[in-house]
Amino acid sequence: MIAYTMVGTTDLPRAISFYDALFDLMNLEICWRDDQSSSWGKKADLSYPRFFTGYPFDGNRGSVGNGTMTAFAVHEPAIIDQLHRTALSNGGSDEGGPGLRPQYGTGFYAAYVRDPDGNKLAFICYDA
């Protein structure tokens, strides 16, 4: 259903460093990179959704959407724990530590962070 998501940044090198560390743990590849944006996904599989970060096309400062969040499916709670630690050690901030969230369903395990620009991310597993 989703082809790609893009979040704005005010500092592309910082954003690339943050997302490279996370997506390396998720075995995602760099699909595109230039002086304006970068994307990750599965380079040879155009049906796999990609995630972009970059400077806004209109030239204005990148900003965060209120209520906007990108959730990444992860298959093991231990990887979610590691992603949360990696995000925090690379300039991200905590929005909810790793753990079960039974209010969202049996086995729903998640962690929530913000990237250095304030974009909210979730790492989720449905069958922990």
Regions found by a protein language model. Name each.
Residues W40-L46, V113-P116, Y126:
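Active-site beta-strand termini and strand-to-loop segments that position acidic
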Residues K120-F123:
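Short glycine-/small-residue motifs
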Residues D35, K42-Q82:
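Long, continuous compositionally biased terminal/linker segments
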Residues M1-I16, T70, D127-A128:
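N-terminal beta-strand motif that seeds the catalytic metal site of vicinal oxygen chelate
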Residues V7-R50:
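Core segments of cupin and vicinal oxygen chelate
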Residues P102-Q103, Y126-A128:
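A short acidic/small-residue loop/turn micro-motif
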Residues T10-R14, A71-A111, P116:
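Vicinal oxygen chelate
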